[in-house]
Amino acid sequence: MTKRNIKVYLKDKTAIIFSMMTQIIILGLYLLFLKQNYVDSMTSMLDGFNIKTEDNLINALVNSWLVSGVIGTSVVTVAMNSLSVMISDKQNKIDYDYNASSVKGSTVVLSYFSGAVINTIVISAILLTAGIAFSCISGSSFPEFTELLKLYGLVILGSVSAVLILMFVASFFKKNSTYAAFNTLISVAIGFVIGAYIPVSQFSDGVQTFVNLIPGSHIAAMIRNVLVSPCINDISTSLAGADHGMFAVEAEKAFATNLNLFGNEVDFTFMMMYSIGAILLFLVLNLISYKFSSKRKD
């Protein structure tokens, strides 16, 4: 059944295109004006310290931020579109056929979950691999083995988290039309929420706290932390202490490698625990939702 759900999603070219729509928008905005804006911003920051660095290092930093935004949004949008299979089955009454058969309801639900997770991991991992290659070509150093493990591990963590959260939300939808409208809304908003269009640090403290309560923001920030921090360190090393370490401090704030919650900065460890907590919470909520839906069918 998991294989069937994966095939249904992959055969729907429209769903795949919509899965990538946010990433296409991010790339378009980046190429049109975002990249130059942030390159100019970093250059101005260095000019403020009366020092210069190589342009390729600044390009690598900004490109790494782009890649983190693409991956941070992909784990959400791919998960959301993968779960459209579940909504289609409801609308077409295929779930009634499952209920009439010997297949357990829990098996059906698990197949939707596993299919969506596999789709999300595979597509996001492909995008991450392409993103790392792009960053290296632009001048970024190739990630160390431990950093690669972190990045692909975060893709898995983000995929599981996104599917669990969106699966709970999707359980309240019965028609493709309403789910498609919700899908469009989230696809547009997620780029702002995780700081893919504009770094979250540009928002007020209140807005930062609001968007940073969303688990996807923590996944994106951890990916950003792993990808962007080495680039910041490369630039700091090239400055040889001429900035007294201030560039790294300002750049980390500007690109939000850590998040702001209720006026307090939270680090990688907190974000990891928060993400795991969200997974456990929505696992429980999905189990409760499944029990209630099973009782209604009985």
Label the predicted regions.
Residues 29-37, 170-231:
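Transmembrane helix segments
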Residues 238-298:
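Junction motif at the cytosolic side of a transmembrane helix
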Residues 25, 59-137:
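Hydrophobic alpha-helical transmembrane segments of multi-pass membrane transport proteins
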